[in-house]
């Protein structure tokens, strides 16, 4: 049996009742988080452009777009919602691989579940299974695939969307293998587009293409036996430097990678989160202001420089991928939320001047969420701190209360207080709902 066929067998065999309670709870946490960041992004210019395009397509109204409430086809809804979910880079992260599993999977699940009338519990289970597949695909090619320049959220994410949709549709193992082929050949996304509007198209297309692949396989589309492990398959072509086959199918259904997933406290690239923790801690402990600081030195994992070395960002999205801006904004504002990543903040004279004083030194022995921050003051004295695990990491997770605070801040800025609270209540109760419409109706500006 090929790697793809084995995976298809695992997906088909899992029953919702076999999922641990904590997995269902974590699935709800990811939905709280992803709807919060999506609703917060609804008025962004690229979202408006994408929504206008979706409206012009004139598709049969079967699924709901977050925010605007546009009703369109499931694949188009998945595309727009997948884009919104990742635009602000405020979605969750699978720490072993830096995959963002929710943005490509939940939009596909919500659109399909709404269309076919799936129960809330089945939607949660489908998400968990899809996220698991995306994480396992990622682990099977990490770090070689990412190092080659691929954006793992787009490439691995499509497999997760396929798996989730296939499970909801109750496809056979043969159909699932075919769907993985249809979706897998569309695995795409290059890291060159980081810091631009285009980056969020990766999970958007993954969600839409994955859902489409499942529907086509249901209709009889076929593919090769092993799109993942074949001679010219995913591993061979998109991860030529290496792969780990055991990471894909080992202990499937017994071990859940949602345990290694983290929710973001800051609205920027996750590898900068530990340095923001450190800078904010020192700022608050020593009442630091920008005019006192001669330099900020960050001792960090190599990935920080590889992904976030933009000393002079020009616009908001570039600021999200500038460790210099993240550190400077953290010291000036004591935060790293949406307000710290606007065009105005990126061009703010105080923050710009402080960015020029931020440097990094690679510590190859450090983990990806580990840093030491040293701040030198104008009088020559220094203050420093060590962060072993960033806030939001699996070792230092965001609590439900902290998640609700993040949710309320983001959604409350767009919806009324009553509407905000009603949606939150609906998400937490989704596992008892007959369908997902209690959520999809409330995730729009008009509400129920």
Spans of model-derived segments:
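Glycine/serine-rich anion-binding loops at beta->alpha junctions
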Residues: 96-103, 151, 155
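Short amphipathic alpha-helical face segments that pack within enzyme cores
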Residues: 103-111, 156, 160-164, 274-277, ...
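Glycine-rich, mobile lid/loop segments that gate access to catalytic sites or pores
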Residues: 113-212, 224-231
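Function-dense linear segments that define catalytic or interfacial modules
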Residues: 79-94, 101-119, 133
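Amphipathic, well-ordered alpha-helical segments in soluble domains
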Residues: 3, 7, 104, 126-129, ...
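Contiguous domain-boundary segments centered on the initiation and propagation of an alpha-helix
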Residues: 99-103, 118-121, 125-128, 339-344
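Terminal-appendage/accessory-domain detector
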Residues: 1-98, 191, 195-208, 212-448
